[in-house]
C-alpha cells in the first residue's frame, strides 16, 4: 500500500500561522432565531420508529386556531430519537416529539394510564390491566394521533407557558399547565383533526 504524506499542521501565510479548524460558531435552531419554522426529522434510533412525517406536522399546525401567536419564538419542531422514559421535550425555541417504540403494545404505569385515560379512550386505544400497570395496544394511526393531539400539544403548552411569562426565559407553570393546554386544544381541534387525517 502506498503511503500518503498528509500535512497535519496549519500553513504559515505572510508570517502568520493559519487556523487549522474553522473557528466560526455554526448557527442552529437551538441558539439562533429562524426565518421560518424548521421541522427536523432525526434518526429514530434502534428499536424506535417515527410514525410522524414532516408533512403531518405541517398539516397539524394548520389546524391550530392561534398558530400565528403560538409560533412566536418557536424555531423548530424536532422529530427526535426515541427514549424509553420520554415522549417529548421542550427547550427554549424548540419542541421535540420522540420516536415511538417499534412495538405498538406499550406498558404504562397505572398512574400514567389514569392521567391519560380520556385521551386514550377518545382515540380508541385498547387496553387491559397487567401486573404493575396497563397494556395499551395502539395502531399506527392511533400513535400518530396521540403524538400530535397529546404529546406535541403538551410540548407546545410548555412553549406557550414560556412565551407568556414576563421574562420569556423559562416555562414557570410546569407540567399541570402543559397538560391542561394539551387537553383543552385537543378538544377544540378534534373534529378538524379527523377531517384532515381521517378516522382512527
Where are these regions (language model features)?
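Hydrophobic, Leu/Ile/Phe/Ala-enriched alpha-helical segments that form helix-helix packing faces
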Residues: 60-68, 156, 185-189
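Active-site recognition of the HExxH zinc-binding catalytic motif
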Residues: 150-163, 178
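Alpha-helix capping at helix-to-loop junctions
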Residues: 158, 162-165, 187, 191
